[in-house]
């Protein structure tokens, strides 16, 4: 099972943690997106959108990290713990996954990605969207140890990757006590946390280098 990735990518780190939780071995194929490896014809043939992460399992190619995570659990999970089969429980996990993609991570991208290109962050309005995203997450976690039920699911793992990316960029999680409590626990119970954090540190290093270069 070939896994095309960059350790810096939040989505890539999500899949790595899910695979570790399942005990699934990935054949890691590093792509250097800064060198445009993702645009090479052999990769575009696998994924016309030329995005990472991309998984190729016995000739079946799938991309988008949350889709990959669910696929791995559905195919290789010994049970449905990480992605419940019960329709209501599954719907809640899916809602949190979509929240991560469309709200939480989106707010990160809009505020912090400009640092990579211009050396300056997004607008004050963009930062307010981050704050509102965390306010929502804080509400979701009221009285809860996990984001979608009473145990670890793929939703926790995806959101853990995103929240750790915010932390490495010095976003203050302590303003959101439920999130901070959840995060402290999630780091302890999620397989592959150390690898996730290492990738987040690497991502911050790339941004810092670009920001310094932009100031020269």
UniProtKB/Swiss-Prot annotation:
It is an enzyme of class 2 (transferase). PROSITE patterns: GST_CTER, GST_NTER. GO terms for biological process: glutathione metabolic process; response to toxic substance. Residues 1-80 form the GST N-terminal domain. Residues 86-207 form the GST C-terminal domain. GO terms for molecular function: glutathione transferase activity. CDD domains: GST_C_Delta_Epsilon, GST_N_Delta_Epsilon. It comes from the Eukaryota. Disulfide bonds: none annotated. It holds the Pfam family GST_N. Keywords: Detoxification, Transferase. Its EC number is 2.5.1.18. Glutathione binds at residues 50-52, 64-66. It catalyses: RX + glutathione = an S-substituted glutathione + a halide anion + H(+). One of its GO terms (cellular component) is cytoplasm. Belongs to the GST superfamily. Delta family. Homodimer. Conjugation of reduced glutathione to a wide number of exogenous and endogenous hydrophobic electrophiles. May be involved in detoxification. This is Glutathione S-transferase D5. It comes from Drosophila melanogaster (Fruit fly).
């Amino acid at each position: 099972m070939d896994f095309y990735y960059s350790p810096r990518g939040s989505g890539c780190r999500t899949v790595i943690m899910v695979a570790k939780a399942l005990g699934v071995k990935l054949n890691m194929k590093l792509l250097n997106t800064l060198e445009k490896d993702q645009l090479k014809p052999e990769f575009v043939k696998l994924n016309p959108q030329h995005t990472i992460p991309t998984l190729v399992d016995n000739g079946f190619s799938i991309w988008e990290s949350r889709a990959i995570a669910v696929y791995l659990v559905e195919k290789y999970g010994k049970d449905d713990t990480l992605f419940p089969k019960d329709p209501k429980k599954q719907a809640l996990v899916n809602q949190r996954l979509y929240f991560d993609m469309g709200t939480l991570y989106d707010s990160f991208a809009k505020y912090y990605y400009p640092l990579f290109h211009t050396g300056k962050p997004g607008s004050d309005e963009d930062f307010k969207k981050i704050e509102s995203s965390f306010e929502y997450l804080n509400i979701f976690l009221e009285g809860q140890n996990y984001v979608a039920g009473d145990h670890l699911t793929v939703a926790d793992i995806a959101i853990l990757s995103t929240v750790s990316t915010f932390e490495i960029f010095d976003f203050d999680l302590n303003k959101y006590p439920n999130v901070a409590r959840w995060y402290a626990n999630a780091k302890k119970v999620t397989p592959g946390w150390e690898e996730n954090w290492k990738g987040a540190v690497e991502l911050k290093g790339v941004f810092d280098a670009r920001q310094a270069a932009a100031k020269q």
